[in-house]
Curated annotation (Swiss-Prot):
UniProt cross-references to InterPro entries, sorted A to Z: ADH-like_C (IPR013149), ADH-like_N (IPR013154), GroES-like_sf (IPR011032), NAD(P)-bd_dom_sf (IPR036291), PKS_ER (IPR020843), Quin_OxRdtase/zeta-crystal_CS (IPR002364), Zn-ADH-like_protein (IPR051397)
UniProt induction comment: Up-regulated by high fat diet. Down-regulated in white adipose tissue in ob/on mice.
The keyword Acetylation belongs to this UniProt entry's keyword annotation: yes
Protein source organism: Mus musculus
Cellular-component GO terms for this entry: mitochondrion; peroxisome
Name under which the protein is recorded: Prostaglandin reductase-3
Modified residues (N6-acetyllysine): K35
One Pfam family named in its UniProt record: ADH_N
Main location: other
Protein's job: Functions as 15-oxo-prostaglandin 13-reductase and acts on 15-keto-PGE1, 15-keto-PGE2, 15-keto-PGE1-alpha and 15-keto-PGE2-alpha with highest efficiency towards 15-keto-PGE2-alpha. Overexpression represses transcriptional activity of PPARG and inhibits adipocyte differentiation.
GO MF annotation terms: 15-oxoprostaglandin 13-oxidase [NAD(P)+] activity; zinc ion binding
Origin organism lineage: Eukaryota, Metazoa, Chordata, Craniata, Vertebrata
Assigned keywords, A-Z: Acetylation, Lipid metabolism, NADP, Oxidoreductase, Peroxisome, Phosphoprotein
Amino acid sequence: MLRLAAAGARAIVDMSYARHFLDFQGSAIPRTMQKLVVTRLSPNFHEAVTLRRDCPVPLPGDGDLLVRNRFVGINASDINYSAGRYDPSLKPPFDIGFEGIGEVVALGLSASARYTVGQAVAYMAPGSFAEYTVVPASIAIPMPSVKPEYLTMLVSGTTAYLSLEELGELSEGKKVLVTAAAGGTGQFAVQLSKIAKCHVIGTCSSDEKAAFLKSIGCDRPINYRTEPVETVLKQEYPEGVDVVYESVGGAMFDLAVDALATKGRLIVIGFISGYQSPTGLSPIKAGVLPTKLLKKSASLRGFFLNHYFSKYQAAMERLLELYARGDLVCEVDLGHLAPDGRFIGLESVFQAVDYMYTGKNTGKLVVELPHPVSSKL
């Protein structure tokens, strides 16, 4: 027999497994939804991405969850993805958005062995800039509740944790320089370095951000708008720094290379200063780089999260443990100080991306999708 939900809702075939596809704890699943779609390749997010309002809500397969997104994360690399830089074989139109957190509203039979409707889950997978996203149960992460703080760990937190763990060789007393330290991933690099008993220097762009860095344990915040970073490092750290966590690129990268101590390690997790350019790159003094590294027995180490998925789950467990103990601050920026106010709804993803590239955010930029949920915030 065919069971019909409320007007405008999806029809559900009432078979022995039908209960696995019912949203019995919330409103009926609609037929259509809104989502963001890349319709042309460009690093200009406004030119590349279109908000579509009448997309079919996808059905979960046997091993899948249908997640109603409540919060989605903004990443500097969103415009790299919209420009087609990560997968040249991917042609428009395609979905966008790397991470989300919300509630399970439907699921396949196999997925129901581990998950239930109404459960809070987070995930890192393409297509989060949508009201609903199908997520393989195998990559979903159960969460205590639908809080934006948990979202900050998915990309930003794990990038800092795994890069420092695998490449940083942190130990007590080492000096660590974190660029863009008050941003989404920088905040984690600062705190994880302090947990490792390192001395941490962090660059930022305002006195307010410097105060935030102090509050999370940064030993020497540097507001580069009022203090030349190069001068501070030369005067206060004449022997150099042991580790650099670098995400800015360009002139900041060159400065970081010069600041390395003997046997220092520079970890490149990004170069946001170049992402908006046609090439996606920021010019550096590459010609002299081999000589500078050689003279110090220093090393340059790249980090791309996708290459460390085998250790992703353990990293998330560690971050969740630190947060639960109160040893980790997960700062969320929902746009309260943005020109157009708080980021609410998929249409505000465009404003949130713009805001990120003004450099004014403190912590992880997050957009709220206002759905009724049963989880307590």
